[in-house]
From Swiss-Prot:
Its cofactor is [4Fe-4S] cluster. It comes from Archaeoglobus fulgidus (strain ATCC 49558 / DSM 4304 / JCM 9628 / NBRC 100126 / VC-16). The keyword Metal-binding applies. Disulfide bonds: none annotated. This is 7,8-didemethyl-8-hydroxy-5-deazariboflavin synthase. Consists of two subunits, CofG and CofH. Pfam families: Radical_SAM. Belongs to the radical SAM superfamily. CofG family.
Amino acid sequence: MKIVTYSKNVFIPLTRNCRNRCDYCGFRSEEIGVMSAEEVRKILSAARGAKEALFTFGERPDEVYPEFKAMLLEMGYKSMVDYILEMNKIAVEMGFLPHTNAGILSKEEMRKLKPYNASMGLMLEQAVELECHANSPGKKPEVRIKMIRDAGKLQIPFTTGILVGIGEGREDRLYSLEIIAEIQDNYGHIQEVIVQNFKPKKGTPMENTPPPTLEEMLEAVKAAREILPQEVAIQIPPNLVDDIYPFLKAGANDVGGISNVTHDYINPESPWPEVERLERALRGEFILKERLPIYPRFVKLKWYGEALEPLIEKYSDADGYARP
């Protein structure tokens, strides 16, 4: 039987401030604020059974909000990256393996964060310019492609993906997947590709845009499986689709991070399913297996820093999956 993987995580949205203004986003906020170290510790303390600390938040807020920059300086940090690093270290101290998706980072910034991250991520979304990204400098395809390549040069286990239904066409989706495949052929660092469906959010410019159909999503998953190298997992977010089974039959083999203590702050209207419900959705045709935020292949290759070694050795089994 084929294996379907998932990770037990805790979601830490450090800030909703962001330099991008994407037409579909309901997460971004103008209210200046950042989670304190105490808040981060509190969330982590409540995260029973989780091994992954998922840090996802607005992109480069310190570059567009002078008040945000001033707040960081007052807290003793020169930049958001310095603050992220400190929060990553707290997570490691408390027994969690960080995965950071901070939006666009330079090669040097990723180099700085690498020792304290089991993996990192950045959605490609689409490799073409789209109207919904007109006010989002960080969503320029060439900027995102460069970062994904740079992560490969640094040998950082990496998550990327496509967002389906944001104004792109079928050919654009195929092109985006081909770009990811080409990067993987060169660097070998991409562990998973998320095929995510757009969901309209009230109060956004795209609130009346219809989401992609089930057929479009299944076709995108099939295309991803055909185009991407076999070692790359295809992830379908289980809280954004009604039934994961057809997607697994189409080629998906990962259901991402699942949390029993925090909700999906990007899609708050879509709660994560319980592991037991996921088990039932597999209909006895697949084996559900817990993994770490670093995939088994990279555990075996030791693509991680010394700071994470004790935790990875503690949490991983002989095959690189999470110990039961």
